[in-house]
């Protein structure tokens, strides 16, 4: 679910009925509208995405951050100091707030794209983002199949993502701890 501060009462009410909430910030709140993060984004919108995600994590409402690297979705082959900085801020906020970072299998199901260097990659999970996560030993990580069809529950792509995590020496949690 998205986070918007004007719905704080609603999030608090939900938490009386469920064990935890998952943050999946798919849209940014602009002055008079919402902006779909799956569209082309500018660096200013990427910073806004990071600020909204960090604000949400700081509320304590969320236990999992879904596809934390979604901000780079349209630019899988762009990685620079700004992307590194933004990613570190998100990762560190997740650690500070005891929030799991989700490696999202559905991103891998979108298929392989070519990087500028000519190698095969996914739009997400994003290799450079998860390399950064591997530097943070306190980061909590889960893999989520993000099933939109029953056939996706534990498919070959899910196995590929587990292998991806293994190659990066990411310690993937089997259970959510409260």
Predicted regions and their residues:
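Extended substrate/RNA-proximal surfaces in nucleic-acid metabolism proteins
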Residues: 1-97, 102
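Charged catalytic cores and adjacent phosphate/nucleic-acid-binding surfaces used
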Residues: 72-73, 78-178
């Amino acid at each position: 679910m998205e986070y918007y501060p004007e719905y704080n009462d609603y999030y608090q009410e939900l938490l009386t009925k469920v064990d935890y909430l998952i943050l999946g910030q798919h849209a940014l709140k602009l002055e008079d509208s919402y902006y779909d993060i799956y569209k082309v984004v500018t660096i200013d919108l990427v910073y806004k995405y990071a600020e909204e995600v960090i604000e949400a994590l700081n509320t304590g409402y969320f236990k999992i951050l879904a596809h934390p690297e979604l901000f780079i979705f349209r630019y899988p082959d762009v990685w620079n100091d700004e992307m590194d900085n933004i990613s570190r801020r998100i990762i560190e906020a997740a650690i500070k707030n005891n929030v799991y970072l989700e490696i999202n299998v559905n991103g891998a199901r979108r298929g392989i794209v070519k990087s500028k260097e000519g190698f095969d990659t996914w739009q997400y999970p994003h290799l450079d983002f998860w390399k950064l996560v591997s530097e943070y030993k306190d980061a909590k990580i889960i893999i989520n199949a993000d099933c939109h069809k029953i056939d996706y529950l534990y498919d070959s792509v899910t196995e590929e993502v587990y292998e991806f995590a293994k190659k990066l020496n990411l310690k993937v949690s089997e259970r959510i701890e409260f």
